[in-house]
């Protein structure tokens, strides 16, 4: 009886880990497809794929950053800024944070908010001197 119970627990753990791996693969596949579309300048379809990646993993800083880049290319600057801001709160890698803050600076500069642009560029330099 005890052995049977242990087998059920192990089987359930296996299924849960398999589901997690499957979700990670789906997220990665959406990001890769989005990247291909972005590089081909098909920004609307790239946006769709990055949003699908975020549905799979709402805390993906990579998806947020890439979505921000895609939205920026479509002149959707406010939405892009929201994605960069969200990514900046999650991302831990200093180089990636530098890129996020640099892009925020570019958007602030384009919107003629020079004080915020300077602050964003300073944050970028703090993460990647």
Identify the residue ranges that each predicted region occupies:
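Canonical positions in the second alpha-helix
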Residues: 53, 87-90, 124
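Short coil turns that delineate tetratricopeptide repeat
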Residues: 58, 92-95, 129
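TPR alpha-solenoid repeat register
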Residues: 63, 97-100
